[in-house]
Amino acid sequence: MSEQEDQEAPKQFTFGTVGFDARFPNTNQTKHCFQSYIDYFRCIKAKGEDFVPCKQFWHAYQSLCPMEWVERWDEQRENGTFPAPI
């Protein structure tokens, strides 16, 4: 192998998901998904988008929630019809 080929070696992908949350011990993570979505937007509303602990909720709902749900919830938030207070 040439030196250039060594430098262009692809980076290894690391797959990660949200860790265990004792509030949601069952295998069905629907409630965890929804609660993480709500918690994220409550957190950034209270502390701002740059508040690092809010990212934990973001990672959780991005990992657990189907994107179709997130898109629908985003639309509902924009329209003021989201079913939970944020």
Curated annotation (Swiss-Prot):
The keyword Flavoprotein does not apply. It is found in: Mitochondrion inner membrane. Keywords: Disulfide bond, Membrane, Mitochondrion, Mitochondrion inner membrane. Pathway: Energy metabolism; oxidative phosphorylation. A motif (Cx10C motif) lies at residues 54-65. It holds the Pfam family COX6B. InterPro entries: COX6B-like, CX6/COA6-like_sf, Cyt_c_oxidase_su6B. It is a peripheral membrane protein. GO terms for cellular component: mitochondrial inner membrane; mitochondrion; respiratory chain complex IV. It comes from the Eukaryota. A motif (Cx9C motif) lies at residues 33-43. One of its GO terms (biological process) is mitochondrial electron transport, cytochrome c to oxygen. Component of the cytochrome c oxidase (complex IV, CIV), a multisubunit enzyme composed of a catalytic core of 3 subunits and several supernumerary subunits. The complex exists as a monomer or a dimer and forms supercomplexes (SCs) in the inner mitochondrial membrane with ubiquinol-cytochrome c oxidoreductase (cytochrome b-c1 complex, complex III, CIII). Belongs to the cytochrome c oxidase subunit 6B family. PANTHER family: CYTOCHROME C OXIDASE SUBUNIT 12, MITOCHONDRIAL, CYTOCHROME C OXIDASE SUBUNIT 6B. Component of the cytochrome c oxidase, the last enzyme in the mitochondrial electron transport chain which drives oxidative phosphorylation. The respiratory chain contains 3 multisubunit complexes succinate dehydrogenase (complex II, CII), ubiquinol-cytochrome c oxidoreductase (cytochrome b-c1 complex, complex III, CIII) and cytochrome c oxidase (complex IV, CIV), that cooperate to transfer electrons derived from NADH and succinate to molecular oxygen, creating an electrochemical gradient over the inner membrane that drives transmembrane transport and the ATP synthase. This is Cytochrome c oxidase subunit 12, mitochondrial. It comes from Schizosaccharomyces pombe (strain 972 / ATCC 24843). The lineage of its organism: Eukaryota, Fungi, Dikarya, Ascomycota, Taphrinomycotina.
